[in-house]
Amino acid sequence: MKAYLDLMRHVLDNGTDKSDRTGTGTRSVFGYQMRFDLGKGFPLLTTKKLHLRSIIHELLWFLKGDTNIKYLKDNNVSIWDEWADENGDLGPVYGYQWRSWPAPDGRHIDQIANVVEQIKKNPDSRRLIVSAWNPALVDEMALPPCHALFQFYVADGKLSCQLYQRSADIFLGVPFNIASYALLTMMMAQVCGLEAGEFVHTFGDAHLYRNHFEQAALQLEREPRALPVMKINPEVKDLFAFKFEDFELEGYDPHPHIKAVVSV
């Protein structure tokens, strides 16, 4: 995961100090890209331990089209707690936009199902896109989508994915985002009869919060270790049929966890 450490170092050394919505303050750069070859291991950060359970359950929750944190709470995942209302609702966030984008004529568009179908029928299409950024509903969301749009690309029997992330919390959020979209790409590839290719991560405002500088410096002192391998149940051929038990991580040997406060 040298690419991730390079991003962190680049922002610390070359970023601009800015104010932000949370009042914490950031150091940020605008425009950056990382690439991960999914054939060379699963890109789960090794310079600090990550909670893979949260990453997998959040992705499954997105794919269900769910926007209430009950499923997450039932599975001991708390990453969305700060933004939910008293009933656990988040408004029309990722899952709703992915699976039930409202059209002007009253229809609801299942963007994920449509993309799976198009990858199978027309893999050379340049329209294999899912957007979570719906301007008409942004104000109703507890948190507007940070990872806003992603596109798939098929070449030489491999499926690749590029994510555009408008806002990226480098220390806390980005490691989760890398693993989540890498896993989604692998799942999509399997159900479409393809191999996983690359995950390309493109950023708009990539930032380190000021209260994460010490943690970032500590992480930069650590040597990356070999990437783990993600095993996915080969029997699952329906993207929406995956369960937590269908994933097994092998060979994950990270450095210890580093605590940091999330800015809400």
Swiss-Prot record:
Top-rank lineage group of the source organism: Bacteria
Family note: Belongs to the thymidylate synthase family. Bacterial-type ThyA subfamily.
CDD domains the record matches: TS_Pyrimidine_HMase
Family annotation (InterPro entries): Thymidate_synth/dCMP_Mease (IPR045097), Thymidate_synth/dCMP_Mease_dom (IPR023451), Thymidate_synth/dCMP_Mease_sf (IPR036926), Thymidylate_synthase (IPR000398), Thymidylate_synthase_AS (IPR020940)
Native species: Neisseria gonorrhoeae (strain ATCC 700825 / FA 1090)
Reported function: Catalyzes the reductive methylation of 2'-deoxyuridine-5'-monophosphate (dUMP) to 2'-deoxythymidine-5'-monophosphate (dTMP) while utilizing 5,10-methylenetetrahydrofolate (mTHF) as the methyl donor and reductant in the reaction, yielding dihydrofolate (DHF) as a by-product. This enzymatic reaction provides an intracellular de novo source of dTMP, an essential precursor for DNA biosynthesis.
Gene Ontology molecular functions: thymidylate synthase activity
Gene behind the chain: thyA
Binding site for dUMP: 21, 126-127, 166-169, 177, 207-209
HAMAP family on file: Thymidy_synth_bact (MF_00008)
Pathways involved: Pyrimidine metabolism; dTTP biosynthesis
Keyword Nucleotide-binding attached: no
Assembly and oligomerization: Homodimer.
GO CC, one annotated term: cytosol
Transmembrane region(s): none
Protein residues bound to (6R)-5,10-methylene-5,6,7,8-tetrahydrofolate: 51, 169, 263
Protein's name in the database: Thymidylate synthase
Active site per database record: 146
Subcellular location: Cytoplasm
EC number(s) recorded for this UniProt protein: 2.1.1.45
Catalytic activity: dUMP + (6R)-5,10-methylene-5,6,7,8-tetrahydrofolate = 7,8-dihydrofolate + dTMP
Keyword DNA repair: no
Top-tier EC class: transferase
Keywords: Cytoplasm, Methyltransferase, Nucleotide biosynthesis, Transferase
GO annotation, biological process: dTMP biosynthetic process; dTTP biosynthetic process; methylation
